[in-house]
Amino acid sequence: MAAELYPASINTNLPNSNSTAVTAASKKTIVQVTQTVTTPTTTATQQNINNNNVETASWQSTHPTLRERNALMFNNELMADVHFVVGPPGASQKVPAHKYVLAVGSSVFGAMFYGDLAEGESEIHIPDVEPAAFLILLKYMYSDEIELEADTVLATLYAAKKYIVPALAKACVTFLETSLEAKNACVLLSQSRLFEEPELTLRCWEVIDAQAELALHSEGFCEIDLQTLEIILKRETLNTREAVVFQAALDWAVAECKRQGLGPTARNKRAVLGKALYLVRIPTMTLEEFANGAAQSDVLTLEETHDVFLWYTAANKPKLEFPLQKRKGLTPQRCHRFQSSAYRSNQWRYRGRCDSIQFAVDKRIFIAGLGLYGSSGGKAEYSVKIELKRQGVTLAQNLTKFISDGSSNTFSVWFEHPVQVEQDTFYTVSAVLDGNELSYFGQEGMTEVQCGKVTFQFQCSSDSTNGTGVQGGQIPELVFYA
């Protein structure tokens, strides 16, 4: 009778290969990740082909290193003394292997084949691991090569955890951290908790907090489990409006109704949300947001809707089950690159020209906006287009206005959403102002600025056509979250 091997402690509720959990699936990304571990020589497609191409009886002499000879045995029937039937019934794949190689690479396999309770079965069923992930695991154990792809990395992490292969697990986590963005952060949060990867969990929270609106509007948010939903809705540092949180909860409820085979009626949405609904801080919405959104959703009872309206308007406020305190969100930090500001006649003037500067940071941050100088001649309004680019590619831009009061203070202008900025890479920020008034400008600029735990470096930008550079000019501040 064939043996069956199930995980001892890890939940098998994994996303399938079509999950949206990881979306950075370009081949370039894969190569970059594998280079930090080893040099790949076999593609993922080739891994599904038996390696039974031993040319001659003296094949050992043509493969001089132990690593080459071992690699040749990967997925090879030659001398195989065990077979695995990997994957669920109907979608399984038979994989040949060699007990000794597996045992020296994994304590789980060591105990399985050579421990006190070793089984003598020649065919072992592993229904909870995807075949592609199992082949990646075996390839690493035979050759030290790791090649990860977006659609299999979570399943590979599961396999690496199950068979206690920490180097492969670490490579998977690194890949996930590299590909982490707002649209997959919520799904990866649920998986990082499942796999007990605290560093990945922390990175997910950084993205979800700073880019909360993007994360909550993503398709991936609707795929999370109820427990992860509740954890996110409790989050004090979500940096978004409560109306966005409420709508995200409704979107999740619609998806959950479909998963449970229910129609997305108001009653069913309320039922699948359960107590999670009371984690939304409805009273912290503006009256207009509540009246045009939650009050018309039909998810709240008539009594709840009535009481919330009274809470907004009545002196004697009713007791509500919803939290009353506004979320703290994130406090924006400001990197100021000038030591002083000044004003001289005929400077700083705007004629539709671009003020621009390049910067790099030593840790990942989220750029939320820019601080700009305003008029030196009293109150004035400026139209401004701000832009953030990396290697010539526009990552974010916004066309807006700001009013200055005649002081030398900086005035914040914001991108629509905070933008993730990676470490050790130069980015370009630009501002094109339109206004008749002369403005203040910065001087005694610094090439390096320490701002909290983040170090900024500045250099001149070739895009700057209005005089701004490292030593002086516009764009005195970068506004960011870290």
Curated annotation (Swiss-Prot):
Keyword set includes Nucleus: yes
Domain of life assignment: Eukaryota
This protein's record includes keyword Nucleus: yes
Tissue-specific expression: In embryos, expressed in the cranial ganglia.
A Gene Ontology biological process term: neurogenesis
Compartments reported by the entry: Cytoplasm; Nucleus
CDD domains, sorted: BTB_POZ_BTBD6 (cd18349)
Gene Ontology CC annotations of this record: cytosol; nucleus
Residue span(s) of domain BTB: 80-150
Keywords assigned by UniProt, alphabetized: Cytoplasm, Developmental protein, Differentiation, Neurogenesis, Nucleus, Ubl conjugation pathway
Role noted for this protein: Adapter protein for the cul3 E3 ubiquitin-protein ligase complex. Promotes the export of zbtb16/plzf from the nucleus to the cytoplasm and targets zbtb16/plzf for ubiquitination and degradation. Up-regulates neurog1 expression and antagonizes zbtb16/plzf, to promote neurogenesis.
Binding partners and assembly: Interacts with cul3. Interacts (via BTB domain) with zbtb16/plzf.
Protein name (record): BTB/POZ domain-containing protein 6-B
Gene designation per UniProt: btbd6b
